[in-house]
Amino acid sequence: MRRILNNFSTTIAMFVLAIPNGVSAQMNSAEAHAGPAMNYHRVDDRLATGGHFVDGGLADLHGQGVKVVIDLRDKPPSGQKEKLAKLGIEWINIPVVWKAPKQRDFDRFSRAMSKHQDDNVLVQCQANYRASAMTYLYRVVVEKVPEKDAKEDLRAVWEPNDLWQDYMNGIIETAP
């Protein structure tokens, strides 16, 4: 009987300890999916970053006046360009391989961003990691935003892993 009570007590204790983690995970999931795209983050009135679109996300983008989506996924969903075009939104795909970002990726991204510097732009990838990192780089290298300020927006989305931190450091160190 004592063993049964001990096992029962242990099970109850584990369940009670797991509840806050489950609630936190649900809140994080809800937070991650707020806005038109996963991990959506508005940098300013003309620039936002986000991951894949959530339900109703395309209509939300249109309602926010987004004119251009720069998609950094190396394998974007088919039909993305057509869906956005129906809403009057231009779609630009600059494939950036998650595990192997290159200098040329940043160069192409910078050209697209500079071309659309006066437009309302969403920079997108799968989870808003590539998008927020490339946006951070563009703001620091091209727009000359203080690194501390740009980093706040980057960290609102994620803390870059070693590969991406090294990539960003390399771009910044070699920038004119």
Which residues does each predicted region cover?
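Substrate/cofactor-recognition hotspot
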Residues: N128
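Cys-dependent protein tyrosine phosphatase-like superfamily
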Residues: G22-V121, A133-P176
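A periodicity- and composition-biased signal for non-globular, repetitive helical segments
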Residues: F8-S9, Y136
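Bacterial N-terminal signal peptides
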Residues: S9-G22
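Short, surface-exposed ligand- or partner-binding patches at beta-edge/loop junctions that are enriched
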Residues: Q124
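Positively charged n-region of N-terminal signal peptides that target proteins for export
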Residues: M1-N7
